[in-house]
Amino acid sequence: SKKYNKSAYALHNLNLTLNHGQIIGLLGPNGSGKTTLIKLINDLLTPTEGTVLIDGELPGVHSKNIVSYLPDHSYLDGSMKIQDLVSYFADFYEDFSEIRATSMLKDLNIDQTARLKTLSKGNQEKVALILVMSRDAKLYILDEPIGGVDPAARDYILHTILSNYNEHATILISTHLISDIENILDRVLFIQNGELVL
């Protein structure tokens, strides 16, 4: 459970296990608690009650090494060139494949010498997703990866997710665009008013 100050619970008595090798949809309206759950898993928030375990351990150094996280707002430095972002990720994450990232960027005809802020919003989101999916993680957490892009870009993003993750890994995709991703999901979690209803 997670409570902010003395207000109502943002998440209440949530009890779930995410299994290996599944693509899981985390669905629910805006404000339902999806991002709070994601932040708890990523150790960006601390539960008010209960615990979060990742690979049998509390979130920390170990989980940072096995979780690849795409937040709903970009955290990347817009002044950096794409090729420098790729190098940065390669230096920072041992499981990052520079070859995979470069190949996907070429497929999209993204100029790797361009600065991130000069790209369209859709291409910036694709770059962020490519960086996340180029890791060989055990758990991928994607917060609204298709929220701000056109339908063609959504198709590419879903294809990228499906073709570039470790099949033994788990992917948790948070979205309110249910119809766009339901055909790729193995399991659906629906959160409403901070509680799991499905």
Where are these predicted regions, by residue range?
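Catalytic Walker B motif of ABC-type/P-loop ATPase nucleotide-binding domains
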Residues: 140-144, 149
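Conserved ABC transporter NBD signature motif
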Residues: 50-63
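ABC-family P-loop ATPase nucleotide-binding domains
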Residues: 72-127
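Helix-to-loop junction immediately C-terminal to a conserved catalytic motif
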Residues: 42
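The feature captures the beta-strand-to-loop junction immediately N-terminal to the Walker
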Residues: 27-29
